[in-house]
Amino acid sequence: MDNNNWRPSLPNGEPAMDTGDWRTQLPPDSRQKIVNKIMETLKKHLPFSGPEGINELRRIAARFEEKIFSGALNQTDYLRKISMKMLTMETKSQNAAGSSAAIPAANNGTSIDSIPTNQGQLLPGSLSTNQSQAPQPLLSQTMQNNTASGMTGSTALPSSMPPVSSITNNNTTSVVNQNANMQNVAGMLQDSSGQHGLSSNMFSGPQRQMLGRPHAMSSQQQQQPYLYQQQLQQQLLKQNFQSGNVPNPNSLLPSHIQQQQQNVLQPNQLHSSQQPGVPTSATQPSTVNSAPLQGLHTNQQSSPQLSSQQTTQSMLRQHQSSMLRQHPQSQQASGIHQQQSSLPQQSISPLQQQPTQLMRQQAANSSGIQQKQMMGQHVVGDMQQQHQQRLLNQQNNVMNIQQQQSQQQPLQQPQQQQKQQPPAQQQLMSQQNSLQATHQNPLGTQSNVAGLQQPQQQMLNSQVGNSSLQNNQHSVHMLSQPTVGLQRTHQAGHGLYSSQGQQSQNQPSQQQMMPQLQSHHQQLGLQQQPNLLQQDVQQRLQASGQVTGSLLPPQNVVDQQRQLYQSQRTLPEMPSSSLDSTAQTESANGGDWQEEVYQKIKSMKETYLPDLNEIYQRVAAKLQQDSMPQQQRSDQLEKLRQFKTMLERMIQFLSVSKSNIMPALKDKVAYYEKQIIGFLNMHRPRKPVQQGQLPQSQMQPMQQPQSQTVQDQSHDNQTNPQMQSMSMQGAGPRAQQSSMTNMQSNVLSSRPGVSAPQQNIPSSIPASSLESGQGNTLNNGQQVAMGSMQQNTSQLVNNSSASAQSGLSTLQSNVNQPQLSSSLLQHQHLKQQQDQQMQLKQQFQQRQMQQQQLQARQQQQQQQLQARQQAAQLQQMNDMNDLTSRQGMNVSRGMFQQHSMQGQRANYPLQQLKPGAVSSPQLLQGASPQMSQHLSPQVDQKNTVNKMGTPLQPANSPFVVPSPSSTPLAPSPMQVDSEKPGSSSLSMGNIARQQATGMQGVVQSLAIGTPGISASPLLQEFTSPDGNILNSSTITSGKPSATELPIERLIRAVKSISPQALSSAVSDIGSVVSMVDRIAGSAPGNGSRASVGEDLVAMTKCRLQARNFMTQEGMMATKKMKRHTTAMPLSVASLGGSVGDNYKQFAGSETSDLESTATSDGKKARTETEHALLEEIKEINQRLIDTVVEISDDEDAADPSEVAISSIGCEGTTVRFSFIAVSLSPALKAHLSSTQMSPIQPLRLLVPCSYPNGSPSLLDKLPVETSKENEDLSSKAMARFNILLRSLSQPMSLKDIAKTWDACARAVICEYAQQFGGGTFSSKYGTWEKYVAAS
């Protein structure tokens, strides 16, 4: 064969223009028929499920036909290629069961001297679309079929691949016979045109340009500079392993096998464990002593799907032993590729099933795209390549991880191998940074990573040349697919940091493999990794400002990162079709539908993700408790695991990135949302996230250092008993649970709406789990690492609420628990630290006791003041008891004290503690002496206030003021009515008052918020006179002032609150004032009060708020008014200054659930009112000339909202005032018509049913000032009318309004006429002014 066969030139004599002519002459329906035929063939050989599978097959067939159509030279070539493809599929199906294991050893007799000749043929442009070599059609077709045969390094090459010139006919026959059902051979051969150039350049560092053919280099090769550096290091390392030990039997390999070995490994360059062993003897046969490796490539011609490794253990063992017999002198190096040269796929053992499935998930969805790859669908190859290009960084890091492990394993081998270990150690050091970068990658590509690791793990076993290690192959596979449970075991139990565990932690279906993984990690000898990795973790965190000193235990950081990945940032188990189907459609559809689906999922994420995370954390904590050795509840544990897995799937769905949205997901978004809503309805916390709460960074100035330290202690008290018990037991998940627990407990302090998932941990630990003395000792030691250290850490956590779930939240636990490192040897040093910290703890507690006694005296004074104010609040108390009784909480005073002492627990709605849920205050306080000595009611209250810790109060609370005194009082939200989504929290003063009076339950705040606004703090101030105990002046003086005037409290509160809170308060006050004015039937006067009520949504919702306010002020204290006094929509708006301005707000407001008494009373006399109204209108029309009053139909309403007025309970009659201008002179009429002057528009009013007791309401907007345009007569008349209307007495009559409107209209017309000389009026109307006066 000559080299012309490889050139992409057209056959001799065929004009280039003919390429397009045959396409235009092809009948339009013939292509569709061909696509249908291809699809029918695909259906025979590929499994598919439902319409999605059919659509997938249709897309594949269409894209395949399009590629053939665009690449064919003529119609005959087009049909021939498609026929060959289909024939190959049929042949593959028939021969799927038969294939030989390896190329006969007789081929080894060929000399290697012909390699340079073969190299010369692999020149630039060595690909052709011309399949003119008839003697080898099947091999050519095989090469075509395997553009996408699963080789992770191959790109979409032209669809038709002629034979490799360097392979003889004899070799071709052998390959065809042995690989009829293995398309990987062609995939190996496709990149042969440039592989030797690449191999030679691998010694030149990251410069990877292929000789003369940069355009044909795969995209993955262009994007992986770091990968090639790693490959270079591996090459050099393997040379060190082989030099001096192995001769160079170049005569063992035939030239075509040498060439194919290059082609086999280069497309699989992502498998870095394979690539290090790639020999370069084809280019530099005298430089690299890697012939034993080359000899093993004899069998790689018959090894399809190197990436999936679908072989059986037994065959691998036989194959390895046979290869070792063939090459005894290269036993150590030969194992590297023995398992890669896999046998046919016809027998897949159960051990290999899961790796196979994972690789199928990489290639496409679960409907069988993997098999389509075997049939040579170029489309699938493109999908795979697109997806793999997005995953290059992750795969890079995974390869570095595998390389490290592959070099660590020989540590346990004989000394001969240990002598060669230093290069591996050096390379391990050089690869730490890349390994660490892995932990910051999103873990959404786990399935690809897992499948990618399998061949590398197999290389680990065979690299040392010890066939007995094959017994651990199952464990190695499990290393490729570790789960959360596996991580917990091998990280905490052995003090290891498993990079693979980090990569694939979200595959919980493999938890039963924990013991084998554990033992295998011990065999691998990876104990050298943790120190380096932990140092790097510390350096990275310190560089990002997340570590303030050397107090950060590396193991806790490791666990923290894993937990954060689990709960916040991962895509644990997306449906198998999610990853690659995105790559299929991303380029085709342009991402339009992706954006739409992504926005839907984003909105769902904002709505549901906080609740799901809350439930997930609670379940995870519960799972940790129940997994302790003392509690053997296997069934319940299994249910919890399943429940957690379902939660992970939901969170992963909500956290899907835009690039990973697949077409199938588009139709399932609504279904998933329905499932999530149903799930949340069953398991949602009883109170949603409170609105209007400030982040904790704004709460920090309100707290004294003592309060912060107490908060930190209470946090540790929740988690330290559990961690102590687990440390003493030496349980595997100890470090995982402790870090996760601390992270979650700290998240509480900065995630306002998320309940603490493990708040009941201390109460659920049996007493037996805490050995005598150890629990308290550990608590005391960890509670106070240093007094100032705790305070600083608390401030750091509180001021970083936004990033509490991205790593900062565990800093406090790490600071307070320096002894929880990855090694169990530190427990001896731990006890020494505990003794020292115990002394600090006691000193701190003594100081704290003195402050608490002072606080107790202040509490007594507050109780006395509250007792005096109790009588005035009795009615409100009863109302609030009615509300809170629905919660069924019944938290007594003593229980409430325990409830509050648990740090953040009082801030979350799910903690409805039962008596005895907390074992004792002593346990919570860590055997604090002041708790046992001062358990009086005063101390109870004092501790409650002191222990609230980082309170999260409403954003508009006027009581959040810095206090210069030493009283560490700070407002804290309590549990409020769970049925009110916007319920604001009570102030601490109300909490103290509740305890003093023994009131059961948590009192509902008087300021009931609404979805659109935050609750009014001024109303809260008015309705809670005892709330002044928290005002700054009161706290400063230390003595509540009983004689303080309400106006002083008001002024001080207004000065202390934020503009948003003040706006909300004024809006609520204005709403109530205007509502009272409307019910009374009087106008607001100048309109300033009515103009305040702007938020009508809030006005219609805050029923209890307005009622309590009016009851406080004595306006409407009757029960009837309480039931009926609601901020009703203003349809009967009182005539007044700015009532018309407010009309649009009222017209669009929600339907009131209650009516005003005035409106309901007027309904009874509606017929009488209408009769009297008609009589009055008739009388008005008799007296007025230019103004006509008439009853307007609803159809005449210019604004459709007017029609809705009568339908929302405010019935009345619409009256229209029309200015007909009959008194104008003909000259003025002609002038107005000639200038196209707009006439004065009619004025519409709504006469209520209560008329004449109620004033009519304007339906037209009244202008605030006169328009500057002289021609706008209507605007001028309305402006005048607006001014004169305010002088009318209340209630206004229709007659007075009509007279006023008529006078305004005449005055405007008169002014307009005077601009034209004043002579435009007839002398008959010369006494215009007198007529107006007489009327």
Curated annotation (Swiss-Prot):
InterPro entries: KIX_dom_sf, Med15_C, MED15_KIX, MED15a/b/c-like. Residues 258-270, 300-314, 329-362, 401-436, 498-525, 688-712, 957-973 have a biased composition (Low complexity). It comes from the Eukaryota. GO terms for molecular function: chromatin DNA binding; transcription coactivator activity. It is found in: Nucleus. GO terms for cellular component: mediator complex; nucleus. Residues 1-27, 109-172, 190-225, 241-389, 401-448, 496-525, 567-591, 683-815, 947-986, 1146-1165 are annotated as: Disordered. Residues 834-882 form a coiled coil. Belongs to the plant Mediator complex subunit 15 family. Component of the Mediator complex. Component of the Mediator complex, a coactivator involved in the regulated transcription of nearly all RNA polymerase II-dependent genes. Mediator functions as a bridge to convey information from gene-specific regulatory proteins to the basal RNA polymerase II transcription machinery. The Mediator complex, having a compact conformation in its free form, is recruited to promoters by direct interactions with regulatory proteins and serves for the assembly of a functional preinitiation complex with RNA polymerase II and the general transcription factors. This is Mediator of RNA polymerase II transcription subunit 15a. It comes from Arabidopsis thaliana.
